[in-house]
Amino acid sequence: KKETGSIMTVQVVLNDKPGVLVNLLTVFYKANANILTINQNIPVKGKAFVSVSARSENMSIEIDELLKRLFEVQGVIKIDSIVG
């Protein structure tokens, strides 16, 4: 369900391969989510831990659909989300 005026944070575990992060961020872009912050730690054992916070009020799709599309990105291992 679309939350008016809310900020969502998505924590993702990615394979440390070229293009995975940009493909993940493209999903946010295509959904018209306004990205506020991106944090990524140095990859460990081939896995990168990324946190993305975005405003969700103007998204063109529901949050559940966004999460589904993020998980479909090749190289995404795990996703957790917090809608605040």
Language-model segments: residues:
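A conserved regulatory-domain signal marking ACT and ACT-like small-molecule sensing domains
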Residues: 1-84
